[in-house]
Amino acid sequence: MDKFEEYLNKKENEYNIKLALTDTTAVTLKKSGINKKNKEFEAVNSQESNKQLSTLGDSIIKFYLCSYFYEKKENISEKKKYYETDEFLVSVIAKHYNILDKLDYDSTKKPNDYNYIKCGKTSTGKNKKSHNDHKFIATAVEAMIGAIYLINKDDDWYKEISIILKEWMTIK
């Protein structure tokens, strides 16, 4: 069991891990009283989902990747591009750790697979900004990094994140 998996297994004991693995659709279901997947989770309001943690985690992932590739004297922009994409987070990381089995979400409204679909390119070669149904999975992965940071912020959070992200770079 690697470091990220250890944190995933703390879902029942760590509030921030539980929050990281709670999509907004689960919060909506719980508020309406029909969440059957995780009855014990009680959200006070719609902010109690993984959105805020995801923003924090996304920033930490980018910071770490920039630092890592800078120290290796590699092209930061090119090297980090792959590892910070939603496609990598969904198709590689989430799939490897089977995140969907741990994530609280409304499976009637969201896909229950890891088949990330690229949105395509515009005529000028830029990525289209259309909605991707699998984004919520990447959000959960980013939120987990945010939660891990918060759990370790008074200790050596950088070391914990470093171990996890280095492990991610070896997953195919």
Give the positions of each predicted feature.
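Double-stranded RNA-binding/processing signature
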Residues: 1-172
